[in-house]
Amino acid sequence: MCDQTKHSKCCPAKGNQCCPPQQNQCCQSKGNQCCPPKQNQCCQPKGSQCCPPKHNHCCQPKPPCCIQARCCGLETKPEVSPLNMESEPNSPQTQDKGCQTQQQPHSPQNESRPSK
């Protein structure tokens, strides 16, 4: 339906619009819009938006369009996030060990006093 010569690929969704050749492919969800040439392709679920040039096309797990519409920064830190989450549950365990450690040195002090 679109003139491929004048426009780039179109979005197969209701109310889709053609992108000029200088712009990237459109998003295919409500409020479809074309990305400027300096911006990357859009993600394609609800709230699709164009990613700035400093960001990757889309977030994991399935680029270039991911399930959750987000724009990822060039600095990929997906592996660091789960590590931080694992550290949080370890924190209370460390505190518990600290309490036990304080009790141990406290006991011998009590024994030393009656020994005198």
Swiss-Prot record:
It is found in: Cytoplasm; Mitochondrion membrane. GO terms for cellular component: cytoplasm; mitochondrial membrane; mitochondrion. One of its GO terms (biological process) is flagellated sperm motility. It is a peripheral membrane protein. Its main location: cytoplasm. Keywords: Cytoplasm, Fertilization, Membrane, Mitochondrion, Repeat. Residues 80-116 are annotated as: Disordered. Testis. Is selectively expressed in the spermatids of seminiferous tubules. Residues 6-68 are annotated as: 7 X 7 (OR 8) AA approximate repeats. Signal peptide: none annotated. Sequence repeats lie at residues 6-13, 14-21, 30-37, 38-45, 46-53, 54-61, 62-68. The keyword Transferase does not apply. Residues 105-116 have a biased composition (Polar residues). Residues 93-104 have a biased composition (Low complexity). Involved in sperm motility. Its absence is associated with genetic background dependent male infertility. Infertility may be due to reduced sperm motility in the female reproductive tract and inability to penetrate the oocyte zona pellucida. This is Sperm mitochondrial-associated cysteine-rich protein. It comes from Homo sapiens (Human).
